[in-house]
Amino acid sequence: METEAFPPFFPLMNLRRIPYYARVVVCGHLCNGLWRSRLERRRIRGRAIRKAADAYLRPYGAAAAAVPEDAPDRSGSRRVFSLWLQGEAQAPPLVKACLASMRRNAGAEVVVLDERSLADWVDLPEGILRKWKEGRMKPAHFADICRLELLYRHGGVWMDGTDYLDTPLPAWLWEADFFVYLGGDRLRGAYSGIQNCFIRAAKGSYLLKVWREAVLAYWEKEDSAVDYFVHQMLFGAAVAANPRAAALYAEMPALVQDPTHVLWYEWADKPYDEARLHAICAPALFQKTDYKTDAARSPRPGTFADILLAPYR
């Protein structure tokens, strides 16, 4: 997934962001020599974005510095939440396949919400709803807020509609107060810090609480995302500003997201084999997919993509 390093005409859009974009342009592009390999240039660009974002987001992280801590409540939180704003019936075949895999394999109640049913589960701040309805907030960033609110109110596991689940969620996950995969090296993960398409949080999780505080502080003041991965980077800002959150984060299992991107990004166009499917999925809790890829839109016959999508086309 490509990042939005800087939107067009950015100085005219938000004057406070000029230092952020200037640093990204100078350090991530102008001083990023073409003699370097593509991978190295990408890493340098990612580091520049991360440093610029850390400075820009620091005030929002500070909003979470003194959040009071409550005892986590793990009772009644064996529930998986997902969201497809247009409604599951309108979802692409790959999303339908992923949601079906959750219901088949999660070993927990699966709740799939849409824009209409969302209000039955959470009360979103009026300012957030207004920005969403006025088109100032992209669907992805609105969904970022929704997942935190759902887990904050109810506890459970959040899974994106493009997460494929091959085996039941393990006991250790349900026993954890909080878990996310770390960014790793795939898909700009190194500068996003964490993955946010799969989140476990018990009701009352302190890490989720400080993350939510930073996110709400950001969107109360901002009208757009400074970067596509602003949600993940706000987690980093909140943890950096809160010693208790930093201590809890250090205790979390340090698993990188790389093994969650194997099935779709390496095998979608290859001949299907059931034993191979289970072997690919085994090293990770789930597999991230992408309904916008050619493999999802026009799968070649007999491939992993074709077999997984066949019942839903």
Locations of regions flagged by a protein language model:
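Glycosyltransferase-associated regions of secretory-pathway enzymes
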Residues: 1-143, 161-313
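Small-residue hinge/turn detector
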Residues: 144-154
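Active-site acidic Asp-centered loop
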Residues: 154, 159-161
